[in-house]
């Protein structure tokens, strides 16, 4: 198998086993690379990611992890592809760097869980951020957004191995979409991409994955007010969404969805049926 660290998908010869028969064919595998984030010359964490849109990832991660509070506090991002993986050098303001050093967090090896590698349990709980409340979204547009998902999952079509985070406008049009083997990294890429170059800010975000605690935490850090998930919602995610004033909707598929928190942002529904969710 020929592999290049900067490619997202690798073509490979495989053998399909089906009903007792073996057939040789060509398949596609999602590439997974080690990505090291270094802030002002100091190593911070190593993660596993799809090797594309890594500048967006670095910016989104830096924002969603509250290493900086504004994109202007990120002074530069440099990528270096090596045989071992990708080294991302992020330069932040001295004030932010000093605050980062004081966190004393050991995040090495974090791959898919927002709590992995945290030295003390109490350090896993960050102060709750309450998002703004001005966003509104007509629920009728959700189905339109879902119909666009397949066309915005190019790597998933080939490999079946990636998650996607997609930004929606008021009409349910997908205006930005990012894929990654890690669902939280896909969201970081979306957050970073929408923070760069004066990109249009989405009204809502649609995840192809479940909505876990970390996904809601990242959404709150980015002031994402409406979060749709095509899969399930976890208990801690629900609790955090309630406290953070985030409208959280899960199981968005086949013309149905389950509303968990803050339904007042959704238009086009029978308001009486939302009494317990508002």
Swiss-Prot record:
Keyword Ligase: no
Pfam hit, one: FdhD-NarQ
Active-site residues per Swiss-Prot or TrEMBL entry: 113
Xref: InterPro entries: Cytidine_deaminase-like, FdhD
Alphabetical GO biological process terms: Mo-molybdopterin cofactor biosynthetic process
Subcellular location field: Cytoplasm
Keywords assigned: Cytoplasm, Molybdenum cofactor biosynthesis
GO cellular component: cytoplasm
Residues noted as binding Mo-bis(molybdopterin guanine dinucleotide) in the record, renumbered to the chain: 251-256
Keyword match Transit peptide: no
Any one GO molecular function term: sulfurtransferase activity
Physiological role: Required for formate dehydrogenase (FDH) activity. Acts as a sulfur carrier protein that transfers sulfur from IscS to the molybdenum cofactor prior to its insertion into FDH.
Family: Belongs to the FdhD family.
Name of the protein in its database record: Sulfur carrier protein FdhD
Organism: Shewanella oneidensis (strain ATCC 700550 / JCM 31522 / CIP 106686 / LMG 19005 / NCIMB 14063 / MR-1)
């Amino acid at each position: 198998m020929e592999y290049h660290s900067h490619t997202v998908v690798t073509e490979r010869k495989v053998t399909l086993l089906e009903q007792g028969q073996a057939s040789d064919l060509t398949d596609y595998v999602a590439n997974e690379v080690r990505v090291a984030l270094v802030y002002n010359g100091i190593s911070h964490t190593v993660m596993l990611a799809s090797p594309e849109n890594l500048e967006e990832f670095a910016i989104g991660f830096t924002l969603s992890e509250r290493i900086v509070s504004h994109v202007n506090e990120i002074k530069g991002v440099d990528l270096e592809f090596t045989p071992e993986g990708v080294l991302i050098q992020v330069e932040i303001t001295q004030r932010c760097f000093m605050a980062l050093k004081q966190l004393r967090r050991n995040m090495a090896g974090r791959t898919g869980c927002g709590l992995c590698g945290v030295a003390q349990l109490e350090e896993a709980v960050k102060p709750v951020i309450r998002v703004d409340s001005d966003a509104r979204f007509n629920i009728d547009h959700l189905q339109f957004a879902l119909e666009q998902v397949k066309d915005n999952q190019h790597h998933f079509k080939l490999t079946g191995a990636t998650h996607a985070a997609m930004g929606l406008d008021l009409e349910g049009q997908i205006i930005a979409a990012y894929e990654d083997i890690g669902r939280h990294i896909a969201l970081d890429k979306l957050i970073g991409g929408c923070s760069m170059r004066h990109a249009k800010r989405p009204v809502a975000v649609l995840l192809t994955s479940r909505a876990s605690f970390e996904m809601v935490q990242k959404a709150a850090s980015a002031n994402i007010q409406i979060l749709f998930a095509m899969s399930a919602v976890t208990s801690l995610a629900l609790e955090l969404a309630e406290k953070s004033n985030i409208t959280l909707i899960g199981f968005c598929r086949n013309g149905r969805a389950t509303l968990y928190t803050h339904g007042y942002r959704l238009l086009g529904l029978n308001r009486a049926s939302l009494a317990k969710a508002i």
